[in-house]
Amino acid sequence: MTNLFKKTFIILIISFMSLKSAHTNDKVTLLLDWFINPDHGPVIIASEKGIFKDAGLEIEIIPPANPADPPKLVAAGKADIAISYQPQLHMQIHEGLPVTRVGTLVATPLNCLLVLEDGPIKTLSDLKNKKIGYSISGMEQALLSAILKKAKVNKDEVEYVNVNWSLSPSLMSRQVDAVIGAYRNFELNQMKIEGVKGRCFYIEEEGVPPYDELIFIVNNKNINKDMLTKFLDSIEKATQYIINHPDETWKIFSNYSKELNNELNEMAWYDTIPRFALRPAALDKRRYTRFEDFLYEEGLIDKKYSFEKMAIEIY
């Protein structure tokens, strides 16, 4: 009888420990690419609606002190997931960072060439002998090079002006005639709020191959497929909920922090929704190969890697 009691007690303890283990959430550190904004909608909604929690995840969402840090911190094993950009991912891998793309957040470019609607640029050929502002050298100049090439304008026939992050202000003050690197869901709306009409030339229509604007990256030496499957499934559910309930989710998002509840973010919210990846875990291999070819042709990389070096499918 004593032995039977002991066996029963042991079985109960094991069952309790298994049940407790099954209900222990995976703690995950997610580094954002920038301060929280509508581009991060699915992440915030998955958190606020309890979607992450239901999947067994405890996500710590951290905006970076320096936007250049998240990929480096993931590479160093100091964070589990980071949000980054496909164009920068190519460069990071060529620099030797052990990172890879595991999912997509925003599936179209947001970058555009922004001009004043009543300004001198009516067609891209009008860029000849004009001033073009930029904030990041290298990548943005490569994008601009492709745009100019399609417009049959020699890149030596334009003047490049580093305006740092003052993109729309430098355009509105007519310090420059156009800016590259402006986000179509933000700077265009910022100008509208200030009573200035702008116009975007969409780079994917003007010679630049389409790419994923925002992606999820991890350290390629430490890929937790179970955790990432739960994470990407949660992002997919949150994205579907946003698309089905845009007004409700705007209220949820804007209540996440009082700084988010403003006119610019509300306008950007609705402009960003069509850009979210409906299948975050899906991988367009050709998209990564094609952009690698583009960077090679523009001279930003000296050799080409296959897509397997840059991106994987978790399931």
Residues of each region from the PLM?
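Hydrophobic h-region of N-terminal signal peptides that target proteins for export
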Residues: 13-22
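Short helix-capping segments at alpha-helix termini
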Residues: 51-54, 150-155, 194-196, 226, ...
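Short, glycine-/small- and polar/acidic-enriched structural segments
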Residues: 27-163, 168-173, 177-185, 200-201, ...
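Pocket-lining segment of extracytoplasmic ligand-binding domains
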Residues: 87, 166-256
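C-terminal solvent-exposed extensions
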Residues: 292-315
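Secondary-structure end/capping motifs
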Residues: 224-300
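Periplasmic-binding protein-like
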Residues: 39, 105-115, 196-220, 232, ...
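Bacterial N-terminal signal peptides that target proteins for export
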Residues: 1-9
